[in-house]
Amino acid sequence: MTPDTEVRDERADAIRRGMTLLLTRITGRQQAAAYPELRELIDNAGGRYFAGYDNPPGNEVRVSFNAFEVNQTLTRLNMPIWGEERPATLLWLAADFGNGERAELMADDRAPPLRAGVVAGVPSQPLSDEAAELFDEITREILRAADERGLPLVLPELDAEDRMYVRFADVWGAFDPVVERAAERYDVEAILIARVVGTELGTEVNWTVRRGERRETLTTPLARMGIDWLADEFAAQYTTIGGARLTWVTIRGIRSWTDWRVVDVLSSLSIVESAVPDSIVGDDLVLRVAARGDDDQLARLLTLDGRLLRVDSEPGLVFTPAWRTDVESSEPP
């Protein structure tokens, strides 16, 4: 975070702004500071919630907070909490500024300076200074928004393997199946395609989100609005409100001591307070789980990283370890 040199107490201001950013990430709400309930945390950010302040070389400062204290207060205030488990999204961004000036965002562009104007395999004019500056501004705004919202973005390598499937025209033409094929190597939950049109009148971004069979589109004048849109969608699914409740989770296919590590899988989830073996019937392990949120949210998190697969043919929360291929299972819808 960059400190504001115009304020009298830069350190205190940085701590307050750090808490505001943290609350935006944790609650999943864009304007967290506008909620009266959250003023308690912002006003006391330098008190019992404060954990550390680091001022490394450069223009950035790092502020850390006590996660337990923050989460306890949010639970007491009945505010939403979005834990550490966050779906990764592949961002495929293509920009056309006219007159043959085209650019795509690639993985190497996370580190400045951005290599604008590189469109592998496509005849393209080098970007003018004006177009390069605009491309830089747009991409930085998108990456900054993703960081502020806590949305993990994966950028394509745009290497020979990617180019086997996807060309600039495929992204620009919204040929989703082609992009989806290329995205298989990246192991992501969603694909976010951004088509940026830059003209003398301004910038327009056409967004397409693919999540399984779902496809949604949005057109925005501001680059970050697509990121906020997707973050809001994820937050609605993954945030939990209130304290923990008891539920039962069945793990099918427990046949060795190695399989018992599924208990650690459950216990590691941010919404789970405890996961205790309740009974064993055959190779079915039933766990008594205290977790925030409802069963659907718990199921989404349990299958998010691919270690557990849901058994859809059974009612309730029934899963099997992904390393067990001899048990009927399928990915959740």
Residue ranges of model-derived segments:
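A short, hydrophobic beta-strand-centered structural micro-motif
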Residues: 44-55, 91-95, 154-157, 170-202, ...
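Amphipathic beta-strand/beta-sheet edge segments enriched in Tyr/Trp
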Residues: 3, 67-69, 182-227, 299, ...
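Pro/Ala/Gly-rich low-complexity, hydrophilic intrinsically disordered segments
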Residues: 60-95, 104-111, 213-248, 324-333
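N-terminal segment of the mature soluble domain
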Residues: 15-34, 95-172, 262-286, 292, ...
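Signal peptide-directed extracytoplasmic domains
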Residues: 31-120, 135-137, 148
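Extracytoplasmic/secreted envelope proteins and their assembly/folding machinery
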Residues: 12-23, 35, 39, 71-76, ...
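C-terminal soluble interaction/assembly domains
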Residues: 211-213, 219-220, 225, 234-333
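Solvent-exposed coil/turn segments that connect beta secondary-structure elements
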Residues: 2-4, 43, 56, 64-70, ...
